[in-house]
Amino acid sequence: MNERADRSGGAAPGGDRTHRVPVLVVGGSLVGLSTSVFLGRLGVRHTLVERHAGTSIHPRGRGNNVRTMEIFRVAGTEPDIRRAAATLADNHGILQAPTLAGDAGEWLFKQIDPGGGLARFSPSSWCLCSQNDLEPELLTHATNLGGDLRFGTELLSFEADTEGVTAIVKSRETGEHTTIRADYLVAADGPRSPVREQLGIGQSGPGDLFHNVSITFRSRRLADVVGDRRFIVCYLTDENADGALLPVDNRENWVFHAPWHPEQGETVEDFTDERCAAHIRRAIGDPDLDVEITGKAPWHAAQRVARSYRSGRVLLAGDSAHEMSPTGAFGSNTGIQDAHNLAWKLAAVLEGWAGEALLDTYDTERRPVAEATSARAAHRSVEHSHPGFAPPPVAGGGGPGAGTPGGAGRGTGGPGGPGGPGGLGGPGGPGGTGGPGGPGGPGGPDGPRGAGGAPGGGPGGGPGGGGPQRGILNVALGYRYPRGAVVGADPATPVVPEGLDLTGAPGSRAPHLWVRRGQDRLSTLDLYEDSLVLLSDAAQPTGWHEAAAGVAAGMRVPLKSYRVGGSPGADLNPDDEETDWARAHGVTRGGAVLVRPDGFVAWRSPGPAPDPESMLRQVVGTVLARS
């Protein structure tokens, strides 16, 4: 089936010529389009090429986790994305049943954020927006920001040297060739990634995990069978017709994921419309159900991570850098967050306020996140049932995914719903990865704060649950960078901590506090996008604010300084008078916190410094790789 909406009008006109641009983005799916939006917000000229004629038209990859939505909030896209997702705004739970007809089923959980506890940590929340609805919104924003987006344009070849990359692209509509000379190339070209393969970058991980076929269909009577059960995904467990059912509009459009076993000689061609319709009827439990098949897309779940995210002037992002089990909807979210990490670093280097070595920290920071996240996703896949997934027994236990055959198959995508809210007894279903496949849902939040102060309770169980159950909020929001463009981080700190700890530690996502700037109410996270930011106390004459002005001018670095507190002269006033901004960031009122443009803490000083400008200059130089 044609899975892209035609937007080939963006292809370059004219004959052979050389086009010069700071950044060339290869791939125009979620990660490529997000990269374009983030670069556009930072004023970085770029060209994006995508071989397909337009954006995805297949409903898949629906799970956008809270960190992704925070990023989209700062980028100005969140309101439009939520409008595009309005149809499924009231769908929250994961249901499991032998069949839907005549069986109430068992709710694995009914709410993504029971009790609304997520608001303590974030101004945003999860959003179910399928890829076919999300990509057009990103495309519109990227275009409005001045992005040069060329759909229907294929990368034919590229050569990288020490000064940049020379690429040859071809309009698939006209056959015309264009030479593009870029300072950097971002490869968001999917799990098969010709760019990665040409560079000879290998991959680690067990490989393919399982295969499904995503079937889109229409059924007017199915809504009556479903009734008021507003699930994100329903796992149907009849041993002769298992599968995962997902609503597209809660009325007549649906997606069903059926197991596919190519290792047994089964082909995609075996999935005829008649076979698919019969399977769906058996799974639903209604032999007379009206089923009109409208599309089919094979996909696989895999666990692979590139051994390097950078080769000179070329950087990998999204599925070209990592594939992971669909459990928890980590794949596309991790890719979008790759793009966010990379965009500010490219801007800093291209604009001359950071050293070129800053780009090395992209691999240093993001690859361990993908490794830890993919391992956690595989762990949850062992815990949760999914059609076609049967992890082999591993002698001696092993780790998540150990013993899984590492095939060379390529495909993409993943279905599913959110991982369940930990600590509440509800395991979650799988969420989507980033390529063609089924829609994914968000991971559920951790359980209530335990006695020790960390969400999800004590160290005996994972966050958000005991024993093998692990919460997802610490994975989606609490991951950190023990090494990279940070100063003072503990290199022994796990990338994914056992609990959610957003208290201002270097390498972690900065805390969220509601503040007032004049008449405007905003989250502190809204401050972080196009510059470094220094927070200090408005009532303490420690010299941090003046030091920031001196460093910004002397080093020619975009560095904004905000004095926080209820005192006269404060730039930011906490919305709640009881809020202690310094304590929330792990410092005293005499200290300071430096936050990066991506909202991660670069460094903090617990208290005053004898020479704050000298200290800050040294820290900024280290963070930005300034020799």
UniProtKB/Swiss-Prot annotation:
Stretches the record annotates as Disordered: 370-469
The keyword Repressor appears for this protein: no
InterPro entries, per the entry: FAD-bd, FAD/NAD-bd_sf, RIFMO-like
Keywords, sorted A to Z: FAD, Flavoprotein, Oxidoreductase
A molecular function (GO) term: FAD binding
Cofactor(s) this protein requires: FAD
Annotated Gly residues bias: 395-469
EC number per UniProt: 1.14.13.-
Binding site for FAD: 22-51, 309-319
Pfam families according to UniProt: FAD_binding_3, Rng_hyd_C
Family: Belongs to the PheA/TfdB FAD monooxygenase family.
PANTHER family given in the database record: BINDING MONOOXYGENASE, PUTATIVE (JCVI)-RELATED (PTHR43004:SF19), TRK SYSTEM POTASSIUM UPTAKE PROTEIN (PTHR43004)
Functional summary from the UniProt entry: Involved in developmentally regulated synthesis of a compound biosynthetically related to polyketide antibiotics which is essential for spore color in Streptococcus coelicolor.
Name of the molecule in the record: Putative polyketide hydroxylase
Organism for this UniProt entry: Streptomyces coelicolor (strain ATCC BAA-471 / A3(2) / M145)
Organismal lineage: Bacteria, Bacillati, Actinomycetota, Actinomycetes, Kitasatosporales
